[in-house]
């Protein structure tokens, strides 16, 4: 069994060369990245009781970034001192990520793999699942695999899209067809997952929800912000019990 959807991997592999082009096809992700990093960093510090004054605050933490792409989240985590492993089912993405991290003198362990193939059981303090779960083939297997890789008491961040009329209008019609922020076909609305559905799946795999936050785009200042509105983008922070 596998969580890999070959069509999804091929889709993102074809864009691999553009990962670090802030004005290219991944421009929306570069715009989205600051709020993701801010939220994840704040929650990690709060959960693990890490002082804001500490230099390299994550230097005792092992982080697994699943579906790491070109390393847009892996690199900021490494700069904060974390021991980062980034995995992606696309070999081309991994090569791009490796080259970019080496150019920036960052030590990140990049592996062409998927979570069910890793052997590091209960190895990681934190797992990052950011905008990945809506692209996997088998959601249950994916979450179960994450649970096996995370230490008891560890944190997991799962960011995805809600399956609502609003998300269809904004994430599919708006982002792909009207604004052309994303290539047409990037998302399949039927694979979007409602927060209550995801919480249930996480609970079955021994995860307890700490917090759910919406992530909302402001078209006037072109910035993302945290929100209580879960109708489109949202992120669940959960701990393994």
Q: Regions from the language model: what does each represent?
A:
Residues 51-56, 61-166, 195-198, 236-240:
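Conserved SAM-binding loop
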Residues 1-26:
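N-terminal, positively charged/glycine-rich alpha-helical extensions of SAM-dependent methyltransferases
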Residues 223-241:
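Core SAM-dependent methyltransferase catalytic element
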Residues 160, 180-197:
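Acceptor-substrate binding/catalytic loop of class I
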Residues 44, 48, 101, 202:
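Conserved hydrophobic residues forming the short capping helix/wall of the S-adenosyl-L-methionine
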Residues 190-206, 212:
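Short alpha-helix
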Residues 167-177:
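Short, flexible, mixed-charge acidic loops at enzyme active sites
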């Amino acid at each position: 069994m596998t969580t890999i959807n070959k069509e999804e991997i091929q889709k993102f592999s074809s864009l691999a060369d553009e990962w670090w082009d802030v004005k290219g096809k991944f421009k929306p992700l570069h715009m989205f990245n600051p709020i993701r990093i801010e939220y994840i960093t704040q929650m990690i510090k709060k959960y693990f009781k890490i002082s804001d004054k500490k230099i390299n605050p994550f230097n005792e933490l092992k982080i697994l970034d699943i579906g790491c792409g070109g390393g847009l989240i892996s690199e900021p985590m490494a700069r904060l001192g974390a021991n980062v492993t980034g995995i992606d089912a696309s070999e081309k993405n991994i090569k791009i990520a490796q080259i970019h991290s080496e150019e920036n003198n960052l030590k990140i362990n990049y592996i062409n793999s998927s979570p069910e193939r890793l052997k590091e059981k209960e190895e990681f303090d934190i797992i990052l699942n950011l905008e990945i779960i809506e692209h996997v083939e088998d959601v249950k297997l994916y979450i179960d695999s994450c649970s096996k890789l995370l230490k008891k008491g560890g944190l997991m961040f799962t960011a995805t899209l809600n399956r609502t009329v609003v998300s269809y209008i904004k994430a599919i019609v708006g982002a792909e067809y009207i604004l052309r922020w994303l290539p047409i076909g990037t998302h399949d609305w039927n694979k979007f997952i409602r927060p209550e559905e995801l919480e249930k799946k996480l609970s079955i795999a021994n995860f307890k929800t700490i917090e759910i936050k919406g992530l909302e785009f402001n078209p006037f200042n072109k910035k993302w912000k945290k929100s209580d509105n879960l109708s489109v983008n949202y992120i669940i922070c959960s701990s393994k019990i």
